[in-house]
Structure formats: structure tokens, C-alpha cells
Amino acid sequence: YITVGTGIGGGAVFREQAIHGRSHPEMGHLLPPRHRLDADYAGCCPYHGSCVEGLASGPSIMARWGKPLSDLPDEHPAHEIIAWYLGHLASTILAVLSPECIVFGGGVMATPGLIDRVRAQALRVAGDYLISSGGNRTTIEEPRLGSVAGLEGALLLAQRAAVRRELV
């Protein structure tokens, strides 16, 4: 799951277990190639400037264009630029984790048409080599629960933790 909002973060699950190393994943801090129309923007991440979070998060969009992505006209270059960065993030996740599915959620992803642009960009970057390998296709989707996905997930995790404590 990748959330795109005030920041960009993500997590991965394998066999119903979260994947992490010594710390939590920092998927939003991957460094993508720069979009040709966005070369002069330094980014807003205080650590890396031009990481995915620094280039495609809500605050980054506001800093460049003064409006949320969803308020900009469909033909505005911001849509292509943001999809570029998120598509590169998706293709990196595909190369490293080879997941069945990548779910993109969060406030920025509520922009109409953005998920389709991200899918198209990921396909351009990763090609059929990563998107469809041996007949197994990775899908790029929106959360099935929409804007309440984060809350529902938190409640489910709390419920599971409570049940485990009762069993111990």
C-alpha cells in the first residue's frame, strides 16, 4: 500500500505479515529520475529534496502550483508530472518486491484519472517485463474501501492485537 497525501509512505505485506527491516519502510524517500518539465523544482523534502515525497506529495503540489492536484484542469502538466513520479515509484516496487498488487491511496490519489495515469506511466517504465511475468500480472489499484481504508485498517490491526492478548 502506498499513501500519497501530506507525505508519501508505503508498506508491504507478505503472507499476512508486514515486511520491514530494522526500521519502517521509507518508500516515499526513493529518488526518481526528474521529469523534463520539472527540472528546476528543488522539492520540498527536508532530507532529500527531490525524493518521491518531495516531488509528488500534497505539500509539493501546493508549493509548485498553489492548488491541490484535483483543482487543476485535466490538461495541466501537473497531472503528467505527478503520475511520472508515482509511476516510477510503482516500477521500483515492482522490480524489488514483485507484488501481486500495488494499492495507491491517500488524498492526492482522489484526483480523478490519476490512478490511470500512474498505471500507464508504470507500464511505460517497467514494461511488460515487470508488469506481466509468466502470466502473473501485477495490478495497480485504488483502495477498495476508498477514503476510509486507513481507518478500517487501523481498527482491524487493533482488533487483531486485542484478540492476541486475550489468547496469551
Pin down the residues of each PLM region:
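ATP-binding/phosphotransfer module of carbohydrate and carboxylate kinases, centering on a glycine-rich
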Residues: 34-168
